[in-house]
Amino acid sequence: MVDSKKRPGKDLDRIDRNILNELQKDGRISNVELSKRVGLSPTPCLERVRRLERQGFIQGYTALLNPHYLDASLLVFVEITLNRGAPDVFEQFNTAVQKLEEIQECHLVSGDFDYLLKTRVPDMSAYRKLLGETLLRLPGVNDTRTYVVMEEVKQSNRLVIKTR
């Protein structure tokens, strides 16, 4: 995790920010095309991309898959409340949830519950099985609340990167 007080992104210049914006739009863009879009020649553009990778601004490249084509149509969010009796319950939960491929995201949150999970499964039957056989058996789980998504109105992984 990056120290928020250091804010490494504030040191990025306009070209670095443009590179990041273009790569968010299309991670498979060729270096030649990227260099044209940001106004650099190919070699300095590639050097900047490599530097942004080394510095951790770019964590990797991935393909966005269509869950409806891959038997993962049902999107479910789950609130998890832990039994706080054990002193290391959060660490145990964190370790256990890391091992679950079905969980796409897990966030420790403030408020009325402790964690918010995001998962995709084929259907409600598969979710019931995941809940009963896996989620309720995670260390320290005291209560869950499930939200089934009826319609995905907006989904994006892009970050807002302002160009100065």
UniProtKB/Swiss-Prot annotation:
Q: Which SMART domains match?
A: HTH_ASNC
Q: Does the keyword Iron apply?
A: no
From the UniProt record, which GO molecular function terms apply? DNA-binding transcription activator activity; DNA-binding transcription repressor activity; identical protein binding; sequence-specific DNA binding; transcription cis-regulatory region binding
Give UniProt keywords alphabetically: Activator, DNA-binding, Transcription, Transcription regulation
Which domain of life does this protein belong to?
Bacteria
Q: What is the effect of changing residue 114 to E?
A: In lrp-1 mutant
Quaternary structure and partners: Homodimer.
Task: Quote the PANTHER family the UniProt record gives.
Answer: LEUCINE-RESPONSIVE REGULATORY PROTEIN
This protein is called what?
Answer: Leucine-responsive regulatory protein
Q: Which organism is it from?
A: Escherichia coli (strain K12)
Organism lineage: Bacteria, Pseudomonadati, Pseudomonadota, Gammaproteobacteria, Enterobacterales
